A protein has these predicted regions:
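Function-determining sites in protein domains
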Residues: 16-169
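Bacterial N-terminal signal peptides
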Residues: 2-12
């Protein structure tokens, strides 16, 4: 009976265990990239924790920072420009082995110099993985990207695209 209870608890509370894990890797994939971009620098990764932002608080906790994860939570978007390059941004953590824990989509508009982040909705790929990790409550919605994320992602994407075209950065 005790072993059944232990197994039940292990299956019922994985998100609580994940919450202690730091982001160990971020990958950026896009059709215009020659290869996925991989971010592994611990100082950079420390800025982009999946377990921050909307939907991660508790009753006695202070409200989440308006800018965290890779999102500016204060700027939800009803719509965003169309025809932009879409990048799949994947977050990994070591729990205890490295595994995929969360996926969002990032698009950048060079005309306005703004980036946008999309959280997959209920009927879309990655929704189930995401809500099993953490339910932000904003699934299926767009937000403006956080400037700290823009400062990391845009140069990496531009550099990868320059290499693909055969030019040097």
């Amino acid at each position: 009976m005790l072993s059944v209870l232990v197994i039940f608890l292990l299956l019922a509370i994985p998100a609580e265990l994940f919450a202690k894990a730091e982001t160990s890797k971020i990958t950026i994939k896009g059709t215009d990239l020659s290869a996925p971009i991989e971010i592994r620098d611990p100082k950079t990764l420390a800025n982009f924790a999946v377990w921050t932002g909307t939907g991660t608080g508790c009753t006695p906790c202070p409200p989440p920072s308006p800018e965290s994860f890779i999102v500016d939570w204060s700027q939800p978007m009803a719509d965003h420009p169309t025809g932009l390059h879409r990048y799949e941004v994947s977050f990994y953590a070591k729990i205890p082995d490295e595994r995929l824990i969360y996926v969002v989509f990032y698009e950048y508009d060079p005309a306005t110099e703004h980036g946008y982040v999309y959280f997959p909705g209920r009927t879309e790929e990655w929704y189930r993985l995401n809500v099993n990790t953490i339910f932000h409550g904003v699934e299926g919605k767009w937000f403006r990207a956080w400037s700290a994320w823009e400062g990391v992602a845009r140069p990496l994407i531009a550099g990868s695209n320059a290499l693909r075209r055969g030019t040097r950065c």
